[in-house]
Each structure stands twice: as structure tokens, then as C-alpha cells.
């Protein structure tokens, strides 16, 4: 002992014995004094010691003060992307709320903690796991007990995203409409941006591009990168402005506006260079890679998939890790690194299946199948394509859906499956693509069908249809798919 109120222990065991000898009342008093001393020393700069202060207040029996500092400590850990640490701390804090008397104070404390749990679970599961759903559902229950419209907006937005990732589009749209109503009522431009962000997602994945573009344009009219990028932490773990740009890029490609799509891709790349948050950068590069795959450009695909995969792996973002792994695998396979590329693409697809991922599964299945076919593994490719077709029939992921049948026809042709089986695949692909308004996919299917018929002396059967589809393109004639179709048509003149 050094003085009446100070202690110095040179060994943990001595300290523990001495601590046990102090009476509970004295112990609580000392913890309170330590907490208050730390507050005085660090003041407003107590972020680095907030967890320590929280622990002392908890041991002092001052639960409300402990909760305030645990909340602050969780915010600090979230800023450093330490999501698991934040979740552990927040769950402990939620357990402390149970010590408080039931009432508005306890409800408000738990709501603040649950909001941060929502943020953490959304980040580390990409809305794919049950944990994010449970966190948002509990937060919604709490929002109904207190009047907090901004928190209600955030919770409804999160539940919309959970529904979107489960391809429950009607539920997603209904929640997005509620977000629009609240944002309009509050008059907050940032919330209005995120409300449009919620609204365009289900329309995009349903292929209702006119309505999706309407909300995208409304959102982009509001969007300012410096002001609104930080919102991504709470809304989608990706930047709203970037989302509008890359989803419209993919939509324009699907509709056959290829030059406009490439122009929009240039905006994606330009904005990606300005983004500051790792999750947003990984997201931007993953989607840039998806578009480069559609353009059949493995070098450019690798240019974007590689940094996206590195960031996603380091930070633990499952959704972009899956996308970038499959894309990176394809790019390597197309450039001759077959074994490494296929292994990486399969790793991504296995992770997608484990996470029960439902968005982009058609394109990802096509990517893996193309990689396998490049290596001459056509039987395996057909297995992947059949699984992709089954997923499409269940989840209706539209982009590249008809390409699954086109690729299956290509694989069957190599395996000498017979004219009728191959033609059926191409015809199915063409019919589906035309029904979905997927002009590039329709062109691909029609091109392969004409090639097949030429080889069997029956070219006139589908040549006119290919001519009609090709004539429907007013731009993008220098892209690989249009160049190949044009060459094929010229050979038949």
C-alpha cells in the first residue's frame, strides 16, 4: 500500500488476491472512482478508453453509464471494421439492459444497441444470414415501442435488403414504399436517396428497368459522394450512387444499349476511384468485373476482380468475396491458368451455395461453366449449368439466365449429343431471351443456332431471325458478340 488510497501490485496473482479481499461495496466504489478518473483524463477523447470505462462502470453497478460507454466503444470498433468484436460487446451490453427496470429508458438503450448490431451483422453476412434478419426484426419490435422515425426508416431499409437477398421481391418493394413515405415525411435528402436506392433494387432484379431507372435517376439527382458515401455503413454496405451506376450499366447491356453501358461503366470506374470505404470499393470493382465478363474481356475482368477479392477477403465481406472469386477464376482460366482459375471459381460458387446466395446466380453459373468448358471439362460444365437452371427456375435471377441454355447447347455439341438435343437448348435460350428482353443473350442464342444449322445444311431456318435480332442493335457493333454475328451473317450472303 502506498498512501491511504493508492495501491501498487507487481504480480497478477497478488493483485487478484488483494482484489478479492476488498469488500463488494469498497470494490464498487473503487471502480466508480477509476471510471470517473478516466473520464476526467480523456474527456471528449475517450473513444480509445470507452470499453475500459464501460467495464469499470459495470463493476460499479452503474448500468446506464456502462451502457453509454459500451455503445461508444462499439461505434469505435465498427469504424475500424472490427465487426466480431463489436457484436460481442453489443451482445454483452444488451444483456445488461435486462438489469434495468422495464420501461422507456431500457427500450431506448436496447434500440440504440440493436441498431449497431444491425450494422455489424449486415456487414459480415451481407444480409445473407439469419443473424441480420433477427437483429432487424428485434429492432423493429423496439421501434414500435418508441417514436423514432429515423431509426424506423433504417430498420425498414434493412428488412427490405434482407428480403431482396432472399429474392422476396414483393416484400422488398412493400418495405421500400414505406421507406419512401418516411423519407418524404422527414424531408431528409440522404434518407430520400436511400429510399430510392431501396426502390430500384427489386425493380432491377425483376427486369422492370423503366421503373428501376426512374428511381435511379431520382437518386443520382440527390447523390453527392462526400456527403452520402458514409450512409452506406447503415444502408446496404455499398454506396447508393455506385449501385445506381453499375446496376444501370448491366441493365443497359441486357437491353442492347452497349455503348451507353460502356459509357456508364466509365462513370463506375471514375466514382470507384473517389470512394473511401473498403466495402464500397470492393463492391464497385466486383460489379465492374461482372460487366467486363459480359464483354468477354478477361484482362479487364482481372483488373477489377483482383483488388475486389483482396479487400473482401481481408475485411470479410462475403457477397463481394463470392462475386470477385468467381470472376477472378474465370479471368485466369480464360488466360490459360486453367487449374488455378477453375479452383478459384469453384471456391466462390461453393461459398455462394453455403451462404444460400440467390442474386447473380445465373451469371455466376455461366462463368464457372465457361471456365470448365475452356478446359475441356464439358460434362462438369453441364452439371453446373443444370444446377444454374434449377436455381433460375426457383429464384428467377434474370441476367444471363438464357445463356445457361446456350452454353449447355455448346457443351452438348462438343459431346456429340445429337442435333435435336443441341437445337432444343438453343431454341429454349432464344425463346427465353426474347421473352425477357435480353437482347445480347438472344443474339448469342440465335448465332449459335444458325451455326448449328449451317453445319447441318439448314441455315435458312433461323438466319432471318438472327438478321432481325442483329438489326435491332443501334450501337455496340464493335463488341465481340455483334462482330461474330455480323461475320456469320456475311458468310451466308
Name each model feature, range by range.
Residues 216-252:
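Surface-exposed acidic, glycine/proline-enriched linker/cap segments
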Residues 17, 55, 72-79, 95, ...:
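Tandem amphipathic alpha-helical repeat scaffolds
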Residues 63-153:
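Flexible inter-repeat linkers and adjacent short helices
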Residues 131, 138-141, 383, 387, ...:
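C-terminal non-catalytic interaction modules
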Amino acid at each position: 500500500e502506498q498512501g491511504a488510497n493508492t495501491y501498487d501490485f507487481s504480480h497478477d496473482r497478488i493483485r487478484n488476491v488483494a482484489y478479492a479481499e476488498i469488500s463488494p461495496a469498497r470494490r464498487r466504489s473503487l471502480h466508480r472512482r477509476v471510471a470517473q478518473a478516466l473520464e476526467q483524463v480523456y474527456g471528449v477523447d475517450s473513444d480509445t478508453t470507452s470499453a475500459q470505462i464501460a467495464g469499470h462502470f459495470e463493476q460499479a453497478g452503474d448500468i446506464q453509464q456502462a451502457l453509454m460507454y459500451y455503445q461508444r466503444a462499439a461505434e469505435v470498433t465498427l469504424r475500424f471494421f472490427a465487426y466480431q468484436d463489436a457484436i460481442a460487446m453489443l451482445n454483452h451490453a444488451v444483456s445488461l439492459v435486462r438489469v434495468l427496470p422495464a420501461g422507456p429508458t431500457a427500450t431506448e438503450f436496447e434500440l440504440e444497441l440493436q441498431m449497431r448490431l444491425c450494422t455489424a451483422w449486415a456487414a459480415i453476412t451481407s444480409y445473407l444470414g439469419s443473424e441480420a434478419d433477427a437483429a432487424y426484426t428485434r429492432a423493429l419490435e423496439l421501434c414500435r415501442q418508441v417514436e423514432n422515425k429515423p431509426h424506423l426508416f433504417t430498420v425498414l431499409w434493412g428488412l427490405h435488403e434482407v428480403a431482396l437477398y432472399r429474392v422476396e421481391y414483393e416484400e422488398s418493394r412493400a418495405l421500400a414504399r414505406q421507406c419512401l413515405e418516411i423519407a418524404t415525411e422527414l424531408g431528409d435528402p440522404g434518407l430520400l436517396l436511400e429510399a430510392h436506392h431501396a426502390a430500384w433494387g427489386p425493380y432491377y432484379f425483376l427486369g422492370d428497368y423503366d421503373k428501376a431507372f426512374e428511381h435511379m435517376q431520382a437518386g443520382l439527382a440527390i447523390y453527392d459522394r462526400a456527403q452520402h458515401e458514409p450512409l452506406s455503413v447503415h444502408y446496404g454496405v455499398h454506396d447508393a450512387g455506385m449501385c445506381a451506376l453499375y446496376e444501370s450499366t448491366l441493365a443497359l447491356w441486357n437491353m442492347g444499349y452497349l455503348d451507353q453501358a460502356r459509357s456508364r461503366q466509365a462513370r463506375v470506374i471514375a466514382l470507384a476511384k473517389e470512394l473511401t470505404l473498403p466495402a464500397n470499393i470492393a463492391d464497385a470493382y466486383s460489379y465492374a468485373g461482372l460487366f467486363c465478363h459480359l464483354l468477354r474481356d478477361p484482362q479487364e475482368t482481372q483488373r477489377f476482380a483482383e483488388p475486389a477479392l483482396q479487400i473482401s477477403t481481408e475485411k470479410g465481406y462475403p457477397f463481394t468475396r463470392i462475386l470477385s472469386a468467381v470472376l477472378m477464376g474465370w479471368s485466369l482460366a480464360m488466360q490459360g491458368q486453367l487449374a488455378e482459375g477453375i479452383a478459384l471459381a469453384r471456391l466462390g460458387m461453393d461459398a455462394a451455395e453455403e451462404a444460400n446466395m440467390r442474386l447473380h446466380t445465373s451469371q455466376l453459373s455461366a462463368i464457372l461453366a465457361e471456365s470448365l468448358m475452356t478446359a475441356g471439362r464439358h460434362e462438369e460444365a453441364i452439371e453446373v449449368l443444370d444446377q444454374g437452371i434449377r436455381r433460375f427456375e426457383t429464384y428467377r435471377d434474370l441476367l444471363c439466365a438464357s445463356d445457361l441454355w446456350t452454353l449447355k447447347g455448346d457443351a452438348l455439341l462438343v459431346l456429340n449429343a445429337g442435333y435435336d438435343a443441341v437445337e432444343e437448348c438453343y431454341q429454349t435460350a432464344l425463346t427465353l431471351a426474347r421473352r425477357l428482353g435480353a437482347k445480347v443473350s438472344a443474339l448469342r442464342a440465335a448465332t449459335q443456332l444458325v451455326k448449328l444449322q449451317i453445319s447441318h445444311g439448314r441455315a435458312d431456318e433461323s438466319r432471318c431471325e438472327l438478321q432481325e435480332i442483329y438489326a435491332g442493335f443501334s450501337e455496340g457493333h464493335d463488341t465481340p458478340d455483334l462482330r461474330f454475328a455480323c461475320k456469320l451473317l456475311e458468310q451466308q450472303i
